[in-house]
Amino acid sequence: MAPKFGYWKVKGLVQPTRLLLEHLEETYEERAYDRNEIDAWSNDKFKLGLEFPNLPYYIDGDFKLTQSMAIIRYIADKHNMLGACPKERAEISMLEGAVLDIRMGVLRIAYNKEYETLKVDFLNKLPGRLKMFEDRLSNKTYLNGNCVTHPDFMLYDALDVVLYMDSQCLNEFPKLVSFKKCIEDLPQIKNYLNSSRYIKWPLQGWDATFGGGDTPPK
């Protein structure tokens, strides 16, 4: 039986997990709750046998998980993608945290009514954060070398999000531009991005000041 993956019908913090599943060509059944299905989720929430009921959830046979990072790490671990030794595993964990600094920075201001004001400070600091990844990729195809790991999909998603904040934010970072294109050119990712299953919008919940609503900005 295919694993079951549940979340809202938004990108949110689970888009990297979707990308990882697609890249691995994992068969999975996604339950994407739409904005008018809050009651449906409330009805399902305590019927799935989840120890800590929440979205996202991932049910793999009799093994049931919630929390986005636990889920993506579990899937990566099943495919021996968490590193071959303690140092490599620690580096991958470090990369997770570094990408999350960007993505969570967006989330901290995305729901605020003063988003346009707060965005200025975020974008002023963004080049410094992006430069660290640019330097990391100076002699690498992917963050951990020549093989894709789940932080690559986390970074791809973070770049996708910040480009909506400032479409010029990668202009000084050619390695990041190449990296983003490299991820998009992975065969399974290319197929997914062109499929009806791909969720382009919203980036956050529907009520977010930035990245919310039903349609992306033109």
Swiss-Prot record:
Keyword flag Secreted: no
Top enzyme category: transferase
Spans traversing the lipid bilayer: none
Annotated signal sequence range: none
Domain GST N-terminal residue range list: 1-83
InterPro entries: Glutathione-S-Trfase_C-like, Glutathione-S-Trfase_C_sf, Glutathione_S-Trfase, Glutathione_S-Trfase_N, GST_C, GST_superfamily, Thioredoxin-like_sf
Reaction catalysis annotation: RX + glutathione = an S-substituted glutathione + a halide anion + H(+)
E.C. number(s) listed in UniProt: 2.5.1.18
A single MF term (Gene Ontology): glutathione transferase activity
Tissue occurrence: Tegument and in subtegumentary parenchymal cells. GST 26 may be actively excreted by adult worms.
Pfam families: GST_C_3 (PF14497), GST_N (PF02798)
GO BP, one annotated term: glutathione metabolic process
Residues covered by the GST C-terminal domain: 85-203
UniProt keyword list: Transferase
Coiled coil: none
Binding, glutathione: 7-8, 41-45, 54-55, 67-68
Chain sites annotated for binding substrate: 111
Chain's role: Conjugation of reduced glutathione to a wide number of exogenous and endogenous hydrophobic electrophiles.
Family: Belongs to the GST superfamily. Mu family.
Family annotation (PANTHER family): GLUTATHIONE S-TRANSFERASE, GLUTATHIONE TRANSFERASE
Further details from the record: There are at least three isoenzymes of GST in S.mansoni.
Subunit structure as annotated in this protein's UniProt entry: Homodimer.
Official protein name in the record: Glutathione S-transferase class-mu 26 kDa isozyme
